[in-house]
Every structure is written in C-alpha cells, then in structure tokens.
Amino acid sequence: MAPSMIPFTIKLKTCLKMCIQRLRYAQEKQQAIAKQSRRQVAQLLLTNKEQKAHYRVETLIHDDIHIELLEILELYCELLLARVQVINDISTEEQLVKEHMDDGINEAIRSLIYAILFVDEVKELSQLKDLMAWKINVEFVNGVIADHIDVPEKIIKKCSPSVPKEELVDLYLKEIAKTYDVPYSKLENSLSSSSSNISSDFSDPSGDIEDNDEEKPILALDNDDNDNADAKHPITVKKPRQNSENIKNELKIPKDIKKEVIEKKQSEKKTTKRKTKKEQENDELDELKKRFDALRRK
C-alpha cells in the first residue's frame, strides 16, 4: 500500500504510540541521570564544596522540571490516542476551538506542537506536528509555535526555565543532606535552632500549678458512673465495662425458671434412685438363681 493511501487515523495512532514510548524512555533516562546527580551533590557536600553543590542543584531542578514536562506530554498523547476518531472529524482551527475546548483535545494538540522545540529527544513529535499541519493547516501550527496561541501557562513555564529561587535550592540541598547523611551548614543551623526551641519549651515551667498531682490518690470509678473527679482525686480510672468475659456469676434467675430447674433436678434424682433399686433386685435374683443351679448339680 502506498504511503499516501494510508488513512489518517492509522498514521496518527502509530505516531502517538511512538511518541508515548519515546517519552517514557526519556523519563527513565532523565530520572537515572537525576539520581546520579544527587549522589554527586552529596559527594560535594561531604567535601565541603557547598557553592559547587549549589550550582549542581540548579541543574538538578531544571532536570526535574523537564521530567515533569515529559510526564504531561505523555498524558496528552494518551488522551489523543483514546480520541483518534474524534480528531479525524476535525478539519479547521475554528472547529477545534469551538467543539473541543472542554474535552482537552485542543489543549493537548497545542501543547504537543509547542513543546517540539524544547523536547529534542522525542523526534516523533515533529511527525505529529506535520500531521496536524496536514489535517488543519500550516498557519495553525506556526501560530501555536510563534505566538503561543491557547498554549497552557504551565507548559510555557516548564518550557522556559529560569534561575531557581534560593529557598528551593536550599530545600533540595537539605533533603539531599538528610537522605545521604552528609553535613550541610544550613541544615545544621536549622537543627540547632529547633533543638534550642524544644529545650526552652521544656525548661519553662508554668507558674500556675500549685498542687502536686503525684501526691494525690487515684480514684477508681465504675464505667457507667457519671461522677467527675474532685480536688482530692484528680486522676480517675474507669473500671472495665461488664461484658461476656468479665461478667459476674451473681445472676438473678426468674422464679418460674428456677422452679422448673429444681423440679427437673429432683425428678432426675428419683429416676436415679429407682434405677438403683431395680438393679439391686436384679442382682439378688441372679444370686438366687446361681444358688439353685448349684444345689441341683449336687
């Protein structure tokens, strides 16, 4: 089959699947580099090269922002892949804006086209741009790249890196120092200040306490009692609530049931007595029979 005869939906599906694979691979590669960079920063902190570690952390922050961008672009590709048939029905930019502002298709297409210049490791995005230029028009693609038309602000920020704030760099350095157990001057200062605050909290006793609760007795109350503790018994301990395991043996049995139980026991005793009498009579008869048999033999 000639390339020109391949349907647009098949081209778009193939391109999006390739973009997803490349974006995932780029994320994994970038994460491995970031992990190695953190170890290098920890080594610099260990050798007291904090200024050099500071600059390395700035690069590390830019790498993390780039990884976030790759993750967002992957989600956009997944969204478009799930809605290829819907995209196939789009023919103009006006239709794209009018019908697909709320379902995410307009945002995803513009973001992927705009990010082409900032994601060099995914060449398949340029193929996606060409497909969109063929489907809608070239002016649409050029307007997105040059004028940022309807491109989300979060994508523009992640594609235009700036110098990170000092607080963010310090936070990264502190976390790396904690993770790899290496010294960092600002981390030690923060730990010493927090420990001094804790010690001051414990060293300042409140002057309002006059009585010593340790000398006062402890009062044990029933669990169902609503009595509150008084001044003599500031500490109260509730007894365990009665349940099937700790219930007392002193149960009140109704009179009717009690009568039936007593009568039943008495009848059982009588039957046992009757049985014993009958057994005795049978034993005596057996003995007499044995004696008569013995006399006959003689």
From Swiss-Prot:
It is found in: Cytoplasm; Endosome. It holds the Pfam family Ist1. InterPro entries: Ist1, IST1-like. It comes from the Eukaryota. GO terms for biological process: endosome to plasma membrane protein transport; late endosome to vacuole transport via multivesicular body sorting pathway; protein localization. Involved in a late step in sorting of cargo proteins of the multivesicular body (MVB) for incorporation into intralumenal vesicles. The lumenal sequestrated membrane proteins are targeted into the vacuole after fusion of the endosome with the vacuole. Regulates the recruitment of VPS4 to the ESCRT-III complex, probably in conjunction with DID2, and VPS4 catalyzes the disassembly of the ESCRT-III complex. This is Vacuolar protein sorting-associated protein IST1.
